[in-house]
A protein has these predicted regions:
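Hydrophobic/small residue at the entry helix of a nucleotide-binding pocket
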Residues: 189-190
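Small/polar glycine-rich anion-binding or flexible loop at a beta-alpha turn
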Residues: 293, 341-349
């Protein structure tokens, strides 16, 4: 039997005249994800992406796992291809899916015909194939409303495709079709989730992290690298920029009002991120901020943060509560790494009672009293370490 993977379009199918661009981008991504598994022929027709192995002994379990994490597919299935003769369809369905019918009590056959020249109607095909399978498995009953298993037959131009229930995909749009942004990766729970959600909308991402040794450790840096690697499974390859932030942070601590420290630090980070983002051709910044979660994430504080630089700041978590964020972090397998107890620079020097409704005028006044900050920020941006993050299943962090 000739097994292939089918990927079904979702939102992409609504793109009208630009649809070909999205499909081309999607096929490029699928080929890249599959190239380490084996040689695959990837093509698109009738709103479906076909991933057909061209070698024997390809690990189809691994291939399916790889492409199931690609944004742009509403659902997927592993299918077997056969001729469109009805007897061949019956025999192939039994050979491919017969074992899946053992141990269940109810099933249903679904049929779709994009090849309208096929001599049987969809209801006829469902009825006759269902009768054939009942003859092979007389303990089964048909349940068209809530079956335990579905046998699906798709009659297409190039043959009959037989498979079980579709598996939900990640949805969204192919990464890179919406531009590029720089994600503020702190090491906590929120920022990897923010990267995941923006990549789902088609953004290619680089990451930026602020390190403040000796207050933050090398283990904290490795943790952030691990988070970038974990998100790469969904977001694709990226660059991680690690900014040496000790000097600017100490300068703000020593020269600014204690209650304004957090907002002043965030504005400083945004200015540095702005420089690196533009250098990389990024069109926006991404943060994991959620409204009112901490003192720096009130409306007033966010207003002050936004005013520090001129790129759009995308906040995909802004209306999510922590429970929703944690659920997504578990889904993308970043939660357990995020909660490892290593300090990040956002938590050091934090005042006990930060101002939650700062006014921009007082922030600008405080910055005017720190004339040496701009030079320290420029130095930090210039000395940022670039780490290339490639898509990997092997995360380089234990701790």
């Amino acid at each position: 039997m000739h097994e292939i993977i089918l990927g079904y379009q979702g939102e992409m199918s609504l793109k009208g005249l630009n649809r070909n661009q999205f499909e081309s981008a999607m096929m490029k991504i699928l080929r890249y994800r599959l190239k380490t598994v084996g040689k695959f022929k990837v093509y698109c027709t009738q709103s479906t992406f076909y991933m057909e192995p061209e070698e024997e002994d390809v690990d189809m379990d691994l291939a399916f796992d790889r492409v199931s994490k690609v944004f742009g597919l509403a659902s997927l299935s592993r299918a077997v291809v056969c001729g469109k003769d009805f007897d061949t369809i019956c025999q192939t369905a039994e050979e491919y899916l017969g074992a899946s019918l053992h141990g269940i009590r109810t099933f249903k056959v679904e049929a779709r015909r994009s090849d309208k020249s096929y001599p049987m109607t969809s209801p006829e095909l469902m009825r006759e194939l269902g009768a054939y399978l009942l003859g092979k498995h007389n303990y089964l009953k048909v349940d068209v409303h809530n079956p335990q298993f579905k046998v699906i037959v798709e009659i297409r131009d190039y043959g009959a495709y037989i498979h079980g229930p579709k598996v939900p995909g990640e949805g969204g749009l192919p990464v890179g079709t919406s531009g590029r942004a720089l994600n503020m990766l702190s090491g906590g729970i929120d920022s990897p989730v923010a990267a995941y959600r923006m990549a789902k909308r088609g953004l290619a991402l680089d990451h930026i992290h602020f390190a403040s040794p000796p207050y933050t450790s090398e283990r904290a840096k490795l943790k952030v690298k691990a988070l970038a690697q974990l998100t790469s499974i969904y977001t694709g390859s990226s660059n991680l920029f690690v900014v040496p932030y000790t000097k600017p942070q100490e300068y703000i601590r020593d020269n600014a009002p204690d209650v304004l420290f957090t907002v002043l630090m965030r504005r400083s980070m945004m200015r540095i991120a702005n420089v690196i983002a533009k250098r990389q051709g990024c069109e926006a910044l991404v943060t994991g901020e959620s409204l009112a979660q901490v003192a720096s994430q009130t409306v007033k504080a966010l207003q002050c943060t936004d005013a520090a630089q001129d790129l759009p700041i995308l906040r995909p978590l802004i209306g999510m509560d922590k429970t929703e964020i944690v659920e997504t972090a578990r889904h993308i397998n970043t939660f357990e790494t995020s909660i490892r107890p290593y300090e990040d620079c956002c938590t050091i020097f934090t005042p006990p009672h930060p101002k939650i409704r700062p006014e921009l005028e007082e922030i600008l006044e405080a910055e005017a009293a720190m004339p040496g900050l701009a030079a320290l920020e420029a130095e930090a941006a210039e000395n940022a370490e670039r780490i290339r993050i490639r898509i990997t299943d092997q995360v380089e962090f234990e701790g």
